């Protein structure tokens, strides 16, 4: 997992705040960090999500929560390892569709109806 230092914490957002911003009209942007592959009818890869505004001047990466790691208070970016996990998260946010980029570097944007 990628980690973000405390001085970068303003660039991240928790799930609760993410949900609030989605309901206020912000967009969820899914980024594929590692190309997906299919194994036994399951798509595996690495995806991260950030919340953005329409003109892309506001961007924050989704994080699960703060956790203690060694002596440092560290924040980890939430990574989705399967397309099913990603789709389940988007559905729990209220999205009625999911467009999952399968190639590394691919991006898709989601909004609430």
Regions found by a protein language model. Give the residues of each.
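Short, compact, well-ordered microdomains
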Residues: 71-112
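Short aromatic-glycine-(Arg/Gly/Cys) micro-motifs in beta-strand/loop hairpins
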Residues: 38-75, 95-103
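Generic serine detector
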Residues: 2-3, 24, 34-35, 40, ...
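Generic, low-specificity signal for short hydrophobic/alpha-helical stretches with a mild N-terminal bias
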Residues: 3, 12, 68, 80-82
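Short N-terminal "domain-start" leader segments
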Residues: 1-59
């Amino acid at each position: 997992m990628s980690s973000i230092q405390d001085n970068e914490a303003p660039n991240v957002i928790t799930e609760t705040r993410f949900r609030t911003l989605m309901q206020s009209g912000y967009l969820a942007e899914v980024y594929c960090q590692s190309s997906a592959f299919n194994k036994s009818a399951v798509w595996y890869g690495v995806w991260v999500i950030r919340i953005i505004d329409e003109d892309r001047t506001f961007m924050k990466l989704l994080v699960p929560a703060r956790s203690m790691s060694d002596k440092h208070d560290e924040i980890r970016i939430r990574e989705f390892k399967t397309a099913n996990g990603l789709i389940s998260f988007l559905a729990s946010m209220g999205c009625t569709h999911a467009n999952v980029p399968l190639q590394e570097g691919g991006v898709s944007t989601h909004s609430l109806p």
